[in-house]
Amino acid sequence: MRRIAVINQKGGVGKTTTTVNLAAALAAAGKRVCVIDLDPQAHASTHLGVEPDGTLPSVYDVLVSNKPVASVRKQIDDNLWLVPSDINLAAAEVELAGIVGREVILREALAQDVSCGAGFQPVQGRQHRLEAGATQDCDAESFDFILTDCGPSLGVLTLNALAASDEVFIPLQPHFLALHGLSKLLETTALVSRRINPGLKVSGVVICLYDSGTKLAQEVVTDLKRFLEKSRGTQTPWSAARVFETKIRRNVKLAECPSFGKSIFGYAPKSPGAADYSALAAEVLGDTGTVVGPMKMRVSPEDAPMRQTTRGRVAV
């Protein structure tokens, strides 16, 4: 099982978009995936069709009231589950302030996670192959991936995500100011690795909102790759990190689909955004070939993710 925290303390860089659509791509590829929404804004929950209204069980209850993870987890689609967030989560930082070990509450809850049983809660209005109320073997260890969507901060909620994860994915918009914020984020992962979670590693950077036609975007990616190359052989959590070759291009469909409570594959499966996240999922899985991603789409040259070389733009 791979436990991945998707983090960046800057907002609007593609964290939730990447968490949700990568999860959907992996699930459609046959992997069992659970999304944990640790953002008080609950954008990942809304993106997956679960509207936070303050009454539904959520990750807040896991962190503050010691509820089992299985009691709040919902099945969203085939192979895809969600531990939703709620507006109440905004108060968790204060409520947990005096709790010893508050940074590892989520990790301990996942360690105690058992089979869903009666806690299985399918989202109303969705079609599933499995009947509501059926006993499901979906304890934490049965998942292939757990993706945690973090809020735009480096507070106790994000620390919980880092403590409960093995890997970190960093969505990054290719602007120079984003590189300045990256150093603080990497410092935080190093601190967590030293004091809380020695196995934590930064696996990669996902370039989002990419425009291959701008020189700035290309320069930022080049600088980022150069920085990561210099870290090879060091004792830092990012010593083996890479910039994913798949870059998520600007695409209006990616901006539209959250308002419909759908992933890009449910909203616009033939869009460039779907092609990009399909390719990213294949890269995460280590797959190669012309048929990429969960939708088994053949990506046309004009839709294929592009990377820059000395000879121009080529499909990856």
Where are these regions (language model features)?
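P-loop NTP-binding core
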Residues: 1-316
